[in-house]
Amino acid sequence: MEGSLLVASSTSNNETANTASTDGATRRLSFAKIHEPLDVPNLLALQTDSFDWLVGNERWQARVAKAVEEGDLSVATTSGLADIFEEISPIEDFQGTMSLSFSEPEFADPKYTMAECKDRDATYSAPLYVKAEFMNNNTGEIKQQTVFMGDFPLMTEKGTFVVNGTERVVVSQLVRSPGAYFERTADKTSDKDIFTAKIIPSRGAWFELEIDKRDQVGVRLDRKRKQSVTVLLKALGWTEGQILEEFGQYDSMRATLEKDATETREDALLDIYRKLRPGEPPTVEAAQSLLDNLYFNAKRYDLAKVGRYKINRKLGIDRSLGDKEASVLHVEDIVAMIKFLVALHAGEKTLMGKRDGEDHELRVDVDDIDHFGNRRIRAVGELIENQVRTGLSRMERVVRERMTTQDVEAITPQTLINIRPVVAAIKEFFGTSQLSQFMDQNNPLSGLTHKRRLSALGPGGLSRDRAGMEVRDVHPSHYGRMCPIETPEGPNIGLIGSLASYGRINPFGFIETPYRLVSEGVVSDEVQYLTADDEAEVLIAQANAPLDADKKFSEETVLVRARGGGGEPVLVPAADVQFMDVSPRQMVSVATALIPFLEHDDANRALMGANMQRQAVPLVRSEAPFVGTGMERAAAVDAGDVVIAKKAGVVTEVSAELVVMINDDGTETNYRINKFARSNQGNCYNHRVLVNEGQRLEVGGIIADGPATDQGELALGKNLLVAFMSWEGHNFEDAIILSQRIVAEDVLSSIHIEEHEIDARDTKLGAEEITRDIPNVSEEVLAGLDERGIIHIGAEVEAGDILVGKVTPKGETELTPEERLLRAIFGEKSREVRDTSLKVPHGESGTVIGVRVFDRDNDDELPPGVNQLVRVYVAAKRKITDGDKLAGRHGNKGVISKILPIEDMPFLADGTPVDIVLNPLGVPGRMNVGQVLETHLGWVAKTGWKIEGEPEWVKNLPNLPRETGQTTVATPVFDGAREEEITGLLDSTNVTRDGDRLIDSSGKTRLFDGRSGEPFPDPISVGYMYILKLHHLVDDKIHARSTGPYSMITQQPLGGKAQFGGQRFGEMEVWALEAYGAAYTLQELLTIKSDDIHGRVKVYEAIVKGENIPEPGVPESFKVLIKEMQSLCLNVEVLSTDGTTIEMRDSDDAVFTAAEELGIDLSRAEPSSVEEV
């Protein structure tokens, strides 16, 4: 084994003692055998690098300077915004007498900080200014101005955007790359293959070629009718002689030429024009300009750099990417395209072309469109860039119109420019685009994964319904680029993926992954990034290929991935290997890399495990896992939810909300600490300071833990003592039995914060008012409100309690003389208002922890028509309860069925009761054995060990301490603890006070029944497993309705918890009652409990008065059915048993009189908003 290094998880040194290091984090003891030359890169670089390029900030400039210094020419040297403004300049009027050009976009300082934006519901943005230059071409006069182009949203340090006060993430999109593609499809009518080729531009018309079953080479311009390719060549100025000279050896081209009737270039142009514009009189000039505009005009057609790069590589053309003309097609491109297609049709395997200025042999083959060489990433920067481009092109139209209408002398850049379309385009993108999403802030991992997501959906991408099996499938080129495991279950499976942990995006938008360079069978630590295309041409060994001490392959032959990707791995001589994986976890995403013993889990369950870690709720106290993978530290730090030192220095001041450091360079840095803030998902976002005054920190040292982190490590759940056994059938079908200790000690309790808001507006009848003076409400109901009518902080509230008192003016009715007299005597006070207070919704309760009041009188920015806005934050501590969903990291999920008293739980020989009982039948069928190995290793880590002598299994772990107490261990993905190592450690665990070892080398022990004290008959697997509490809490799902809102038309109760709806008694349920003959129950359900308006009021009346329940009437939906049939001109009448017609009355006045008497309203129509509910 190569050096068999035991690497500490977060650094590459060999410090193995489990001591606190300078930055406060404990070191994990790692079981890794493989030395990794490369640390995991910054996990948010995908977002931040792209945005840096767009705005061209200092970080980006530094990166460009470094790349230029190293001689890397592929890096873009102009920023995204500069590119767009350069592209649109100059805007000329229709005669070309005036022009307007833009340059040097730059940003002023943002108006508010990010925290203020969240507070005020504002967008975190900076004003964008551009230098605009207007030139009168006739006089040569130039006017220059700096023009404001609107507020431009800025990315926060964490890779998010704050839009209208909420954090959003822009997801990167996976799209088909511009370039040249060749396909082969079988013809339905004959046994021949049809060959097609197309050039897909970044924007502009498609160019398609096709060889049909008659071996005719056709061309389709701009998706219109097909015509002969020789016609196009002639229109481009080729003669028949030239065509024969270039393509004479191909039968298909000769056959096409024979059928072609056009003689001259003019004929060919007219012929093309007739096909593209049928019905218009053809002229040579019109045809020439049409053809030019389609493919040869940079304003209308753009291959983009990546399209030119792909065409150059595919067709062996040597045109510089920096060339001004590189973005449009050229005749040589079209000729090379035709040549490639006819060679493919003729069955040739190679063609000669050029690459990097040298002759190069091209492989002639069809393209696989799902290959990652043909799919690229549009990251944030490019998505916003496209949006700004759309806005600017709309603005361009306005500028042109204004140039013609305004007086030339008076024109300045400012008078021409209307920034509205630009601002609107940006706003529309952040507000409504499919790719701008409400950030998943459930825990640090869910946020991190959200930012690293790759989606094939969205504008210009695929749609769920049209995406076939092939696009969704795992492809060999995904290796090291997109995780094969982490993807949603359901309709989006395979369309949404996650970037692999080491992947990065190159300037063309292709995903690259790093490999170690190998020469002459010696592996170096030099790392090279390869795209999927490059990778297909080299031989790559796995990360676990055995090496000797000199980093040479220790075996003659090495297993590598075959050239061209796909297929089975092959054995080749060691000297032929060119590259080697940098790390075994290279192929998986961050969430998947957090699953220990992933190599022992079935992929379907691993998928669920990776997805469910993102649903874990941050608990009141976080605890790092005993068994981790060494990825916990990197994930927590890069997610940005822990506060880390930006510079080395000494802490001078510590409080709950602020930590101040004096840095070594003499500057001072303030670190803000969040206390009990609300995340997007309603979880508690809280920081805990870990440092003391006078403590020294290096760069990256942990200052404060965030939600679900422990000492700077990701900590999504709790280590619980589990037993795999059945218990009275209560853990049937994945149900879980939990100990009362977990509830009593708040082990799995979490804090949830709800935000309630209400505004006081101007209505037609007068202004609404926030007040304590609410009509018809007793004093004790108002006890919690202060003099403003707003609840005070610290109040305990239940469902239905008033949070903010508000009254709205009622419509003034015609007053009776008596009321007029009262009005005259008592003045305005008896004016009618109704109570529209903000109340705690059904099924919610908690403690008020915050109140924010925005008032127009205090110069707060409020929407038009709103005078006051009040926000109340209510926090509730949710203890774990039956019905909550728990899960492990291996896709093993279940619902708590029973919480047992501690004394009834099964216990170990030393009296320790287990915390949780899982059903052993959940393991074999699901094939996620990783959970069992985790359980055993968890026990070992908890008890610590003492290794006697030098057993065989220790030889691979020279750096494992021979003796340790309770510790945390890391078992990296695909390079973790082996079975014999776990067995050996189980045999070496520390003994109890009595000198007993509770669990033997099989990982099993004797358990005793807590109820009887008798031992269970067989040994049972017991150990520590990391258990997560998921965000599927029973309190949010349980729901019951007494009376509530009814639908407008059918008068039936609404459905769903949000509408306070009822449970639908559907068709099949009706059949069940019919089968039992339960006629009266059924009649009640279909009438008075549903939509018999008259009946339900009468029943309520009867219940209140203690009388018998009256006969039901006719359901409203029956009346709707009759109306529907009458509207189809069918005369439907309802007859009684004796044949007389029954009048269908509309809702009777009696209903309303009864309702008035009872003081209830049972005819409520559906509410117009959730607030009314």
From Swiss-Prot:
It is an enzyme of class 2 (transferase). Residues 1-23 are annotated as: Disordered. One of its GO terms (biological process) is DNA-templated transcription. GO terms for cellular component: DNA-directed RNA polymerase complex. The keyword Transferase applies. GO terms for molecular function: DNA binding; DNA-directed RNA polymerase activity; ribonucleoside binding. NCBIfam families: PRK00405.1, rpoB. This is DNA-directed RNA polymerase subunit beta. It comes from Paenarthrobacter aurescens (strain TC1). The gene is rpoB.
